[in-house]
Regions:
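Extended, domain-scale alpha-helical bundle/helix-rich regions
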Residues: 1-72, 76-81
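Acidic, S/T/G-rich, low-cysteine, solvent-exposed domains in lumenal/extracellular/periplasmic regions
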Residues: 291, 312-316, 327-329, 351, ...
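Amphipathic, well-packed alpha-helical segments that form the structural scaffold of globular domains
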Residues: 17-21, 40-44, 48, 108-111, ...
Length: 503
């Protein structure tokens, strides 16, 4: 691959040597904590697919992901050779506010307040991060080698740690307005939810109010790639779109079943709603999508979801009065299975959208069903709930319009071609080592990409290019799946179905 990327033999040799050297170094830097976690998880996964042990550092990272916050300087770090490099800074964080730290700067030393500097060249990234993070209000000093110049000038930057909110991982909304077509100029709201973190429902409620103030005609909730998170937040999120009622059923052991309900009697948004999912939408995402589908409250579009229908509990191994200097980490273990309010389980089967998109991901090849020791699918009794207006008749109309539209859409034509090519190649168990053959394959792929790019440019009324390197830097990446979700939502609005009207 390096030779195909126009590297000389000497350059390829040097680069591979560096890669292998770094890999060996990382292996040698492994600690007993890493080995213990690996051994414990090898045992835990023989019990059940989602039972695991988290080392102290990974347990801390789990809490950070759930709370979308941490205490530190607000910088994203990455290891490059023996250096810890600043890749980006969090807007509004101490690193950003200082004005003294920029992307590509290298951290070569770390000191706590007035203590001596510790040289961190060659250290593991997580160990450097451990030194830099600390309680809000405390001081950390960094020796920084500027990355933007050839001269190796080192400066000392003193920063006061603060609580950092990971805004880039929080729910966001935008107004989607088609520029062409029968609905040109008509606004839809799109709420993108990356995960079910703590207080997600509060964030989404704010985004809904913002979209309503902009008079959107409908809302799309984008759950693509959302692997789940808090079960409580899945219930609260569902409650934003229904007045009250059961959201998910949970069975502990062999018999006890509890029902998580929305009880506030309030609705944040009562208009047309579409939920966009893919094969990587899992767990809490499936709870929300399934509830919306069972209530006939929203139209579900996209790919069949992952199929994770189990509930895990996260518990620290330390006790409140423990006197250990070092934390012990935590365990996650499966305590229950959750079920749709119609009684079915999402385990293995996931949520099957009302309108399925073409997909290269085969459910039999990726998902919960591929996990070793995954619990089986089963079902329980239906919960007591009332559906919204029956949308079956409207669904036939929407599906017909969708199928007709994607047959005429160049982007979906490309997607179908890619799926066909993937299926033809996925079972090949050989690859040519003949340079001329590989170069021919590369040229063919580049020509196909260039032809597609020029077709898109023409469609957008822009000038074509002669090479892929000449593509405009500000050219927006197309999202045909979201575009089609918008088209389906407009179709749904025209039918007058899937709004909140009781039978």
């Amino acid at each position: 691959n390096l030779i195909l990327a126009d590297k000389t033999w000497e350059e390829a040799k040097e680069l591979l040597t560096k890669r292998y050297t770094r890999a060996i170094k990382r292996t040698k830097q492994a600690k007993s904590e890493d080995v213990f976690q690996t051994a414990m998880n090898a045992f835990a996964r023989t019990i059940e697919a989602h039972t695991s042990y988290l080392s102290p550092r990974n347990a801390e990272r789990f809490q950070m992901d759930m709370n979308l916050s941490f205490e530190g300087i607000g910088a994203v770090l990455q290891s490059e050779d023996d250096y810890t490099v600043i890749k980006s800074v969090v807007p509004g964080g101490p690193a950003d506010e200082s004005g003294a730290i920029k992307p590509e700067d290298k951290i070569v030393g770390v000191a706590q307040d007035d203590e001596e500097f510790v040289d961190v060249i060659g250290w593991r990234l997580d160990e450097v991060v451990e030194l830099i993070k600390g309680p809000k209000g405390s001081t950390v000093r960094l020796q920084v080698e500027k990355g933007a110049t050839d001269a190796k000038t080192t400066s000392v930057v003193s920063l006061t740690r603060d609580k950092i909110k990971l805004e880039d991982r929080a729910a966001k909304s935008e107004v989607y307005v088609p520029e062409t077509g029968p609905h040109a100029g008509e606004p839809l709201g799109v709420i993108t939810i990356p995960s079910f973190y703590n207080n997600l429902s509060m964030d989404v409620a704010k985004e809904i109010e913002s979209l309503k103030a902009q008079n959107v005609k409908g809302v799309i909730v984008d759950l693509r790639g959302n692997g789940g998170g808090s079960l409580t937040e899945a219930t609260l999120l569902t409650g934003l779109f229904i007045e009250k009622g059961p959201v998910v059923q949970i069975r502990y052991g062999q018999s006890k079943v509890s029902v998580n309900r929305d009880t506030d009697g309030e609705v944040a948004y009562d208009g047309p709603l579409t939920v966009l999912v893919d094969r990587y939408s899992a767990s809490a995402s499936e709870i929300f999508a399934a509830a919306m589908q069972d209530y006939n409250r929203a139209l579900i579009v996209g790919e069949q979801t992952f199929g994770k229908g189990t509930v895990q509990q996260h518990r620290g191994l330390g006790k409140i009065y423990d006197l250990y200097d070092n934390p012990l980490g935590s365990v996650q273990f499966t305590i229950a299975k959750f079920y749709r309010i119609d009684g079915g389980s999402t385990q293995h089967k996931g949520v099957i959208p009302d309108i399925l998109y073409p997909s290269a991901v085969e459910p039999a090849e990726w998902g919960e069903s591929q996990a070793e020791n995954a619990l089986p699918w089963d079902s329980i009794n239906r919960a007591n709930y009332t559906t919204f207006a029956d949308g079956t008749a409207a669904l036939d109309v929407l599906t017909a319009k969708h199928n007709k539209r994607i047959l005429q859409d160049p982007e979906f034509s490309y997607i179908q071609d890619d799926i066909k090519e993937y299926k033809e190649n996925k079972d090949k168990n050989f690859i040519s080592l003949v340079k001329s053959v590989r170069e021919g394959e590369k040229k063919e792929a580049e020509e196909k990409s260039l032809a597609r790019a020029n077709e898109r440019l023409q469609r957008l009324g822009m000038e074509t290019v002669t090479t892929l390197d000449d593509l405009p830097e500000d050219m927006e990446e197309l999202d045909p799946f979201l575009d089609e979700a918008a088209n389906i939502t407009f179709d749904m609005i025209e039918t007058g179905r899937y709004a909140i009207t009781r039978n």
